Amino acid sequence: MGDDIGTAGVPAFYCCYLLRSIPKRLSYYIGSTPNPVRRLRQHNGLLTKGGAYRTKRQGTRPWELAASVSGFPSKIAALQFEHAWQHPYQTRFIKSEDRIVKKKGGGRSIHQRLAVLKLLLHHPFFKVMSLVVHLFSEDIQRVWFLDKYKLEAPFIHVEVDEDALSEPTGEDEESVIEHAKKNLRLVELFYGRSLKEDSECLEEYRRRLQNGAMRCAICEKIVDYVKDSDSFSSEKELVAFCYNSVCDYFSCLSCLYNVFASDEELRTGEIPLIPTSGQCPNCNIELSWARIVRYSMFLSA
C-alpha cells in the first residue's frame, strides 16, 4: 500500500498534523497529507516540489512534526478536519458555547491548539471515525495530559511515541539540525508502521478469501470472492474480519453492523446511525468499526 488514494476512494493513509518551529518554539502550522514523511521534508526545504510556502518564513525552518491525527476514511474528511483545526473560531464542528478560540487570530498557544483538537474529536462526525492521535514530543505529551481545558475523554485514542524527543540540546545550528533529523526519523518509523500494519492485515484477508467459499459467522451465508471475481456483473459482498491476529472471525459487514449497533443501543439507550466500536463475536476484543469498514472497502474494490 502506497501513499496515494486507494481503490474505492479510500486513502491508504491520511493525517492532519501540527508542526512546530525548532528555532522559534512558539511558531506552529497545521496541515494535512497522505505522506507525512514527504510533507515534512517539503516544509523543511529538503524537497523543492510540493509547495509548503507558508513554512518558509524567515528563521522558522527547520520544523518538527509534533502531533498527528490519522485514520480518516477519505481525503475530504481529513481536509474538513484540517480546516476546522485552522479556524476554530468559526467552524461548525465546535458549538459556539464550547469555543475556546472566539476570534480570528486567537488560539495561538499550544494548550489552545491541542484543546481545539480534542473538541473536534468530540464531534459526532469525527468521533465515529475512531481517529488516532500520535504525539512525537515529550513536552507536547505533557501539555496533552495536563488537559488544561478538561476535555480528555475515554474514547479519544492517543498514542505516545516511546522515543519522543525532549527539547533541542542547544540553540546553535548543529543542535537544531540534529533535532530535526531525529524528528524526521520518528515520523518515518510511525508512517512505516502504519502502512505495514494495514498491509499485513489486508494480505492475510486476501489470502483467506482466495480459498473460495467462506461462511458468515452470523447469518451463515456463503461468500465466495473467487467466484465473484470471475463474474463481471456480480458485486462483491462487503465482508468483515477481526484484526486480532489470532482470531479467524469472518462475517458479512452488514451482519456485524447489526451486532455492533445492537450492543451500542444496549449501552447508551440510543440506536446509532454509525457505531464507533464493538466486541468481536468470536474473541471479544474491542474493534474499531471505522477500521473494519476501511478494510472491507479495500477488499471489495
From Swiss-Prot:
It is found in: Nucleus. SMART domains: GIYc (SM00465). Its EC number is 3.1.-.-. One of its GO terms (biological process) is double-strand break repair via homologous recombination. CDD domains: GIY-YIG_SLX1. A zinc finger (SLX1-type) spans 216-283. Its cofactor is a divalent metal cation. GO terms for molecular function: 5'-flap endonuclease activity; crossover junction DNA endonuclease activity; zinc ion binding. SUPFAM superfamilies: GIY-YIG endonuclease (SSF82771). InterPro entries: GIY-YIG_endonuc, GIY-YIG_endonuc_sf, Slx1, SLX1_C, SLX1_endonuclease, Znf_RING/FYVE/PHD. PANTHER family: STRUCTURE-SPECIFIC ENDONUCLEASE SUBUNIT SLX1 (PTHR20208:SF10). Forms a heterodimer with SLX4. Catalytic subunit of the SLX1-SLX4 structure-specific endonuclease that resolves DNA secondary structures generated during DNA repair and recombination. Has endonuclease activity towards branched DNA substrates, introducing single-strand cuts in duplex DNA close to junctions with ss-DNA. Belongs to the SLX1 family. This is Structure-specific endonuclease subunit SLX1.
